[in-house]
Amino acid sequence: MRTEAQISDAIRLALGSDPGLVLWRNNVGVAEHWNGRGVDVVRYGLAPGSADFVGVLLPAGRFIALEIKSPTGRATPDQVTWLALVRKMGGFAAVVRSVAEARAAIERARGGASE
């Protein structure tokens, strides 16, 4: 069984050559930074639950969000909320588990679906 990281890498490589799509890898998390007096907590990424890939579908400039999961992985409540917000605002959002699912999702987005 492939891990989410392996699936994510395969999707990035497969979709990276699509001239009608621009995708960015979005890392979300928390880190600790020693500031000389103590530890600062640093949060990074767009927002809690934001998708693994965010991007723009050309030529209209439609926002797209892809959440990558392993075959048995489940979206967290924060991820479900993020994906719903993207759809509500007119973007396209999907959970995908393979390159084939990612390609199919992009084609649905091109057809006007919100997912």
Model region roles, listed by residue range:
Residues 1-115:
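Catalytic phosphate/metal-binding cores of nucleic-acid and nucleotide-processing enzymes, i.e., regions
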